Amino acid sequence: MSANSLLGSLRELQVLVLNPPGEVSDALVLQLIRIGCSVRQCWPPPESFDVPVDVVFTSIFQNRHHDEIAALLAAGTPRTTLVALVEYESPAVLSQIIELECHGVITQPLDAHRVLPVLVSARRISEEMAKLKQKTEQLQERIAGQARINQAKALLMQRHGWDEREAHQYLSREAMKRREPILKIAQELLGNEPSA
């Protein structure tokens, strides 16, 4: 995502502030409204999102509300950006930040001038992570598909005494003749093979 498109999209963001009512929540909501985001604040954490949410700002409490926040985030989309609000740093709080896979952290007391830079960098990080996850899944599918094709080649080589090139040519010819991907031909061939 380019800098211009990222900055331009800030006004379209649906933001949820998961924090008890008070000065911190009020200041954060006000700053997010100044940025141009559509903001809702709620506490305690709901069981699910009632509307789509792009960004969640949530307080991290030492061993409290962690499970509820984790369950809520798991129910969201993989592209939801998460920013932690941290009152103090302790091993338990840092562990929760890592477990929740936060994209950004704002320490308290809240400085309104930190909200925009953290929002922009967290949003960019979450978008990049979502793209990388999608690419990883695609690569895993391709590798699994190639493994199936190689299994089909091995079967043809064993069955007909062919070398790998001949087995590949056979799969390619069948795929072109039937106008199907080679993977589909390989899967059909392997699916028709009696199990040992």
From Swiss-Prot:
GO terms for biological process: carbon utilization; cellular catabolic process; regulation of amide catabolic process; transcription antitermination. SMART domains: ANTAR. Coiled coil: none annotated. The keyword Transcription regulation applies. It comes from the Bacteria. The keyword Transcription regulation applies. InterPro entries: AmiR_N (IPR049021), ANTAR (IPR005561), CheY-like_superfamily (IPR011006), Sig_transdc_resp-reg_antiterm (IPR008327), WH-like_DNA-bd_sf (IPR036388). GO terms for molecular function: RNA binding. Keywords: Transcription, Transcription antitermination, Transcription regulation. Residues 129-190 form the ANTAR domain. Signal peptide: none annotated. Forms a complex with AmiC. Positive controlling element of AmiE, the gene for aliphatic amidase. Acts as a transcriptional antitermination factor. It is thought to allow RNA polymerase read through a rho-independent transcription terminator between the AmiE promoter and gene. This is Aliphatic amidase regulator.
